Amino acid sequence: MATEMKRISVLKNIKTSKTAIINLCKYGDVKAVSKEKTIFPFTNDVASEVEIHAKLLTKNLSPKILDSDAALHSIIFEYLEGSNDLINYDELFLTKLGKAIKKLHLMDFNDIGAESFQQKINTYRQIFVDSDDSTILAGFELFDRLYDSPNNLVFCHNDINASNIFYTNDIKLIDWEYAGANLPIYDIASIIKSLKLDEDQTKILLDSYDIKLDVTKIKSFEL
């Protein structure tokens, strides 16, 4: 990737959060999306995100990175045509989503350097080591209970919600800031909770995902 990014012109702000400023822009003559990351201790850095996207691009699961600059904490992505403003999650959408998540979870991730979900939680612990906030402490207790034997880890997005899903003929996911090794049920539970799927919709998702999970634990992971 380039060390000096081609001049970009910002068209409008898409989202500003505690972890990034995301803008619709022109990259040269190409419509694109720019992300300027803030320094946040438990999100993937620019180098890790570039590595993740390169891997996922071969699976058609993410947008292509056009340019990046680690020193500026900036990444330029291709602009995705499609929608992430879906109202009705019909059978076709849920089937494609389940298959996309299955493809993600079956991917070999041993060559990806992103921290695991457990490592990110341990960073939280260090930051809040002296905290007596009951909500924070309850979160750590829940994590320890659910992850008492973290085997069968897969590569997870770890932040799947409606705004991170782009849908045209295929499903692509954006915002891989929290991605890393985790229990597969975490992604599934995140989808069910964030999309507010009912029992029938959940069955369609799980049938298309088609990897055995202990569905009785899904509610516990809807954090």
Which residues does each PLM region occupy?
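ATP-binding glycine-rich phosphate-binding loop
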Residues: 3-27
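An alpha-helical support segment within catalytic cores of ATP-dependent transferases
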Residues: 1-2, 109-158, 207
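A short linear hydrophobic-aromatic micro-motif
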Residues: 9-12, 62-66, 215-218
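Structured catalytic cores of enzymes that bind and process phosphorylated ligands/cofactors
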Residues: 64-66, 104-124, 153-156, 165, ...
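Active-site acidic catalytic loop and adjacent metal/ATP-binding pocket
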Residues: 18, 22-25, 143-186
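ATP-binding pocket architecture of kinase catalytic cores
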Residues: 18-115
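Active-site activation/catalytic loop segments of kinase-like enzymes and analogous catalytic loops
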Residues: 185-213, 223
